[in-house]
A protein has these predicted regions:
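Amphipathic alpha-helical hairpins
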Residues: 1-161
Length: 161
């Protein structure tokens, strides 16, 4: 829970980065597009799923549902920032500089969020199945920041039991 609360604070900072980027690019960050409404709906649905799980009275199950919801959100968030990074690689001039600055400000946090959250979710699911889990997960212990690092950490989990 503490891990995800920290991610929330960083995500709010990332939101500020996007709003600033919109301002720099002359875009209204408050414009409601059809796709933005869908994203909002998905986010609200994930929150509702967590609330429903919490009401079920099983704290371990609620924690696992919350973890799965966070993985869904972080996976999409990571993909969006990765896409912004791809555009930043080819953009030039003021646009390129603005995109690169925004991406560089957020990329490391997004990598951390995704790989660590996936590790927590995997280990909590393993624990829920009654199997030995590595808690905190290897990704956390080894403080991985890349996909390769996350893969290596996961491969080492058996030795950490």
């Amino acid at each position: 829970k503490e891990e995800w609360e920290g991610y929330l604070q960083e995500t709010l900072t990332h939101q500020d980065v996007v709003r600033s980027l919109c301002d720099t690019l002359g875009l209204d960050p408050n414009t409601q597009s059809p796709t933005r409404r869908v994203v909002k709906h998905i986010g609200e649905s994930l929150v509702k799923a967590m609330q429903l799980a919490k009401q079920g009275g099983d704290p371990a199950a609620a924690q696992l549902v919350a973890c799965e919801c966070v993985v869904h959100a972080e996976t999409k968030d990571h993909a969006n920032w990765e896409l912004l990074g791809k555009v930043a690689e080819v953009a030039t001039g003021d646009l390129g500089r603005a995109l690169k600055a925004a991406h560089e400000a957020v990329e490391k946090d997004e990598d951390h969020h995704l790989y660590h959250t996936k590790g927590w979710c995997r280990e909590l699911a393993i624990e829920a199945l009654g199997l030995p889990a590595v808690l905190p997960p290897p990704e956390e212990v080894k403080n991985v920041e890349t996909a390769i690092g996350a893969s290596r950490a996961e491969q080492q989990r058996e030795r950490m039991l």
